[in-house]
Regions:
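Short linear regulatory motifs embedded in intrinsically disordered, acidic Ser/Thr-rich regions
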Residues: 219-223
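Non-catalytic interaction-recognition regions
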Residues: 1-197, 202-213, 230
């Protein structure tokens, strides 16, 4: 653990972080590279935590598609779209990233290196967030709206497939951390009261984790057994 520089038993680690975070972080390095597990990073609920960042991108797209479906804008088949309308730099970057997915999977399998998938998903999530900030998916001309919605849905599918390969869940919704609700507030998806409530809940969860950690460190020595994480 980077927090203390000591070993920590795997079952103790899973008391503090989710299985999803553990799997994502354990797969974040090449097989030949030692892993210093950053426990503080693994419990963060913001864009610095890679698994949270990727899962949030997926959940945000699910929310977007559900809202558009309620408004009568279902995701269309590619054949019915005018993809030439997708010409903004952020749209082109996102399509280029999507096209790289099959090759990344091939290379990860060839080299026995799942960390390639980790890095790809983080990069793809970043490309989506930049696209989402720059390109409106609401109130646009119908043909452009349909094309952008399909692009977002394709990102959703690739994120789900990539997370599944890593054994990490792809949640349709997420309990709000600071990053998630700050982004939603900026996009006008929630109000200030909801964002403040989410921030308070996040602080309470962090305090609970600190208390559990203090109690465990006080009552139980750190183990150096075979199942330790270093």
């Amino acid at each position: 653990s980077k927090r203390s520089g000591k070993a920590i038993a795997l079952h103790d680690l899973l008391d503090e972080i989710s299985v999803d975070a553990a799997r994502y972080f354990f797969n974040s390095r090449t097989p030949s590279t030692p892993l210093d597990f950053d426990l503080d990073l693994a419990v963060r609920e913001d864009s610095e935590n890679p698994v949270y960042y990727v899962q949030y991108a997926y959940a945000r797209i699910c929310s977007l598609i559900a809202r558009q479906a309620t408004a009568g804008n279902a995701v269309a088949q590619v054949e019915a779209l005018d993809t030439d309308l997708l010409s903004a730099p952020e749209e082109l970057a996102l399509m280029k990233a999507l096209a790289q997915f099959p090759e990344e999977i091939h290379l990860a399998a060839r080299d026995y290196d799942p960390s390639r998938i980790n890095r790809y998903l983080v990069d793809l999530a970043g490309d989506f967030h930049r696209f989402y900030r720059a390109c409106r998916i609401n109130g646009e001309e119908p043909a452009l709206l349909a094309a952008r919605l399909k692009l977002a849905d394709t990102v959703r599918s690739v994120l789900a497939n990539g997370l599944n390969l890593l054994g990490v869940s792809a949640p349709d919704t997420m309990a709000g951390g600071g990053f998630l609700y700050e982004s939603k507030l900026e996009a006008g998806e929630i109000d200030q009261e909801t964002a403040e409530r989410a921030a308070k809940e996040k602080a309470e969860r962090e305090e609970q984790r600190r208390q559990k950690r203090k109690a465990r460190e006080k009552n139980r020595p750190l183990s150096d057994e075979a199942d330790d994480v270093r």
